Amino acid sequence: MRHFWLLPAVAGIAGAQCPYLSGEMSFTQEQDNAGDTIEVTEQPIDNTLYVNDTGSYMTTDFGTPISDQTSLKAGPRGPTLLEDFIFRQKLQRFDHERVPERVVHARGAGAYGTFKSYADWSNVTAADFLSANDKETPMFCRFSTVVGFRGSVDTARDVHGHACRFYTDEGNYDIVGINFAPFFIQDAIQFPDLVHAIKPMPNNEIPQAATAHTSAWDFFSQQSTALHSALWLMSGNGIPRSFRHMNGYGVHSFRFVAANGTSKVVRTPWKSQQGVASLVWDEAQAAAGKNSDYHRQDLYNAMPNGHYPKYELQAQIMDEADMLRFGFDLLDPTKLVPEEVVPYTPLGMMELNANPTNYFAEVEQAGFQPGHVVPGIDFTDDPLLQGRLFSYLDTQLTRHGGPNFEQIPVNRPRKPVHNNNRDGFGQQQIPTNNWAYTPNSMSNGYPMQANQTQGHGFFTAPYRYASGHLVRQTSPTFNDHWSQPAMFWNSLIPAEQQMVVNAIVFENSKVNSPHVRKNVVNQLNMVNNNLAVRVARGLGLDEPSPNPTYYTSNKTSNVGTFGKPLLSIEGLQVGFLASNSHPESIKQGQAMAAQFSAAGVDLNIVTEAYADGVNTTYALSDAIDFDALIIADGVQSLFASPALANQMNSTATSTLYPPARPFQILVDSFRYGKPVAAVGSGSVALKNAGIDSSRSGVYTGSSETTEKIAKEVLEGLYTFRFVDRFALDE
């Protein structure tokens, strides 16, 4: 121990002799290409804002060419000098690289795209982006989770943000939505309470990105408006397969206003053209541990591979007189409008086609606001919406340090901005008008005031008016908090109902207050007795007697994530389990790959080690990586069950991957409800795993029938999950 002090000195001497620390590394062509400049794809951002460092010298922020790898010192071993402006600027910029993360929706991913209108919708709205058939508008979308911090996992059970910006010819229009049709609260003044309840406990900041704790379920059981969204959260909607496989909902009622002043009340969801799909809970937890960027990676990889996510913008268009017509209030954001009551009108299609060039500059700095509207779009008196109009604007001041956040490239409109707003932190414009006030005569009154007839300015729906006494009360038309949760429950297939029960039991098993768990069961009993009884059994509580005041047999369509085939299988992943010790298995996978590629599906050949034609290895793979699985002919020795893993002819145990990894991939894929197939002797693996080849979604055949097997797997991918594999408690 007395010689320990020598170690830093010795390390320093050794380091001085290391050629890689000399600053004179030589680059091979392979090394040089490893950090290629990112190709800037066509995006609605001024190209002059992109920085290309190719062939350049290092400079300071103010343009002086420099060398920034060694501090300025008084002699080689002397103190660093305060005058070293290169050191000070480099460290200062590093110290301030981060901005405050969003309080909610901190973790996200984004993409650019294009919206194309299906028709001229000027009979219902003056919005220019909907004014002509095939009119195209650039887009930027950000998808996110809500509760977790920026470094949390993608597959946490959570509400998911679905915010989309139209860069229209008349300014930016944002639909700031989520993947649930209802929200948890009716009044924005309760939003801090909701967020404080669902965030980690303040004493220990546990749990991260989860509502499986006391304060969340205490709030849900006390604030019964939250029940509807809580059931959506416990269903597959809380753990989507990807951002590509979830819908987006604007939640609120807005108004479309035509040029003649007539207005309609609208709800405007985005419907995924891939179809809606979700993970199962064990799979979501495995993904959280194996790949915390599960959803980000899926979106980022999709577009370069030619899989462009599509979402159809739809509208439920209702008359102003319909506000109370359907048995609930259209101003209530905790309610959805069943599509059987008001069908959806398809307005246009959005296709995402380009990744951001820089995550921080574009995704992190994007600031969406429900107050970003254009002529032809107007608000309603929804009390949650009214509060969001303030909150989303206000939060940008803290995140960006001042009022000029709209000048950040991703936030800039694609038309010139003219107003009398001036100065502030981070001002990026140079105004030339010295007369920044209205009215003025010195600049001939410019910029002029725009209205509906001059300048195509924003205008408020003439129908709108306000009168009444000033009160702090909720409208009686908002008081039914249980009928729509009951309708949602009724609309789920039995397997997804079981998932809801299991999720509620799982989360409340982590609630450390007995009276909160009892309150949860009591509230669920207001929704549906069968639901409450099954949860009570799982929590070891007394089974409640029916409380039928709000019970209903009503159902609606397309609110669950199971039981309907996908609309498209493009971009899904199939694992082909092969072996280096049986080269023919790799060739077999290569032969089948073309058939999958023609359907837009990626076939990934998995072996013990990389080789020609191999996409990945068993050490890197897990059942979460694939939407379907095929076992090659001749590789059955990889799939000995754990009890037989040590038998002489088994290669199930290897230093190249964790014990029994191929076997575990097979077992988990089947357990998660995925299509599973085996070619030839690969069917032995199914037998070892206890998988009956006659089960739905299980396909077998000889090595001469691979084309048939591939076709069956492709058909199985449309089903996506075979729910007969999931146990039901009744």
UniProtKB/Swiss-Prot annotation:
Its cofactor is heme. The active site is at residue 105. It catalyses: 2 H2O2 = O2 + 2 H2O. It is an enzyme of class 1 (oxidoreductase). The keyword Oxidoreductase applies. GO terms for biological process: hydrogen peroxide catabolic process; response to oxidative stress. Its EC number is 1.11.1.6. GO terms for cellular component: cytosol. It holds the Pfam family Catalase_C. Heme binds at residue 392. Gene3D superfamilies: 1.20.1370.20, 3.40.50.880, Catalase core domain. Residues 403-433 are annotated as: Disordered. One of its GO terms (molecular function) is metal ion binding. Keywords: Heme, Hydrogen peroxide, Iron, Metal-binding, Oxidoreductase, Peroxidase. Belongs to the catalase family. Occurs in almost all aerobically respiring organisms and serves to protect cells from the toxic effects of hydrogen peroxide. This is Catalase R. It comes from Aspergillus niger. The gene is catR.
